[in-house]
């Protein structure tokens, strides 16, 4: 089949790489415009664009597809002229109007990083960890105009462990998404079968995964240790949990575990011990967490042993 692929980050590039190994023809790739990145703020192509260029696939980077503007209408017409059988969309980042969704012969299929209708929206991986879900997965759906509202065609399941961060879970789901889309697109007959058997989402089970904002990542010591640990794992690798030491300095916290230490009448935010495991801090409900990897402003991330050697933190200190 002739496939258009639309996606931007590494999650999408993993799926594109898998599709490139099939007998299908990737006739075009759509991805977001190049962005400034790194210390030099150089314009950098997305992971999907980089992969497409390596395989000599034409790349399109429209700003939008709004038919109310000349450039949006031109982008729609350009896509239609490609004559695709199906369009695969994964973390593309642009809204696709109904006219675009209807253009390919079999419409547009989306690779979504949750078990829909739970965690529709921008941050399904992070919200699943922060909420304490013990399972997530991938949903392949036929796209509709609403936000992740399309009919479901295929699901895979992935347990969430107590060690998973958004980084590790992202990689697991990216691999599952790649496998899932290849299964759905094994042949034209297979695709027709999954389209015929697709399932409407139960709106009563909908939960939204709202976009992350940096302020959420500030550690709130009044929460119990289990929730603090979930948040630290959910916000790794972005925006990274932090302790606001003073107006200008934040201590980033990359990893943690539930502490085996305790202290009666400890104040929330109080450091009760520093040892080879890490920095043990009191949280709400008389629970305790152990910070195992932290990063001071301008420095590198330190492990538990290195934290103790810096002597920048001390037992009895109250973290804000």
Curated annotation (Swiss-Prot):
InterPro entries: Fmt (IPR005794), Formyl_trans_C (IPR005793), Formyl_trans_C_sf (IPR037022), Formyl_transf_N (IPR002376), Formyl_transf_N_sf (IPR036477), Formyl_transferase-like_C_sf (IPR011034), Met-tRNA-FMT_C (IPR044135), Met-tRNA-FMT_N (IPR041711). It catalyses: L-methionyl-tRNA(fMet) + (6R)-10-formyltetrahydrofolate = N-formyl-L-methionyl-tRNA(fMet) + (6S)-5,6,7,8-tetrahydrofolate + H(+). CDD domains: FMT_core_Met-tRNA-FMT_N, Met_tRNA_FMT_C. Keywords: Protein biosynthesis, Transferase. One of its GO terms (cellular component) is cytosol. SUPFAM superfamilies: FMT C-terminal domain-like, Formyltransferase. GO terms for molecular function: methionyl-tRNA formyltransferase activity. (6S)-5,6,7,8-tetrahydrofolate binds at residues 114-117. Its EC number is 2.1.2.9. Pfam families: Formyl_trans_C (PF02911), Formyl_trans_N (PF00551). NCBIfam families: fmt. Belongs to the Fmt family. Attaches a formyl group to the free amino group of methionyl-tRNA(fMet). The formyl group appears to play a dual role in the initiator identity of N-formylmethionyl-tRNA by promoting its recognition by IF2 and preventing the misappropriation of this tRNA by the elongation apparatus. This is Methionyl-tRNA formyltransferase. It comes from Acinetobacter baumannii (strain ACICU).
């Amino acid at each position: 089949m002739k496939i258009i692929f639309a996606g931007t980050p590494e999650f999408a590039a993993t799926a594109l790489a898998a599709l490139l190994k099939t007998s299908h023809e990737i006739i075009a790739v759509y991805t977001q415009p190049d962005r400034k990145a790194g210390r030099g703020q150089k314009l950098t192509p997305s992971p999907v664009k980089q992969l497409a260029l390596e395989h000599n696939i034409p790349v399109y980077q429209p700003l939008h597809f709004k038919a109310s503007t000349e450039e949006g209408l031109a982008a729609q017409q350009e896509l239609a002229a490609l004559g695709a059988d199906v369009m695969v969309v994964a973390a593309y980042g642009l809204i696709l109007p109904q006219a675009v969704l209807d253009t390919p012969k079999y419409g547009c299929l989306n690779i979504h990083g949750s078990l829909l209708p739970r965690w529709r929206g921008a941050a399904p991986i992070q919200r699943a960890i922060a909420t304490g879900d013990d399972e997530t997965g991938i949903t392949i759906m036929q796209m509709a105009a609403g936000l992740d509202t399309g009919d479901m065609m295929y699901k895979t399941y992935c347990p969430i462990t107590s060690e998973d961060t958004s980084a590790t879970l992202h990689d697991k789901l990216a691999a599952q998404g790649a496998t899932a889309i290849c299964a759905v697109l094994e042949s034209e007959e297979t695709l027709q079968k999954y389209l015929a058997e697709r399932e409407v989402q139960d709106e009563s089970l909908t939960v939204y995964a709202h976009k992350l904002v940096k302020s959420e990542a500030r550690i709130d010591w009044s929460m119990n240790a289990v929730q603090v640990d979930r948040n630290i794992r959910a916000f790794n690798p972005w925006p990274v949990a932090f302790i606001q030491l003073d107006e200008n300095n934040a201590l980033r916290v990359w990893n943690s575990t539930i502490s085996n230490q305790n202290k009666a009448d400890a104040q929330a935010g109080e450091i009760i011990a520093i040892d080879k495991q890490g920095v043990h801090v009191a949280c709400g409900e008389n629970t305790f967490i152990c910070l195992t990897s932290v990063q001071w402003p301008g420095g590198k991330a330190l492990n538990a042993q290195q934290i103790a050697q810096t002597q920048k933190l001390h037992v009895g200190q109250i973290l804000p």
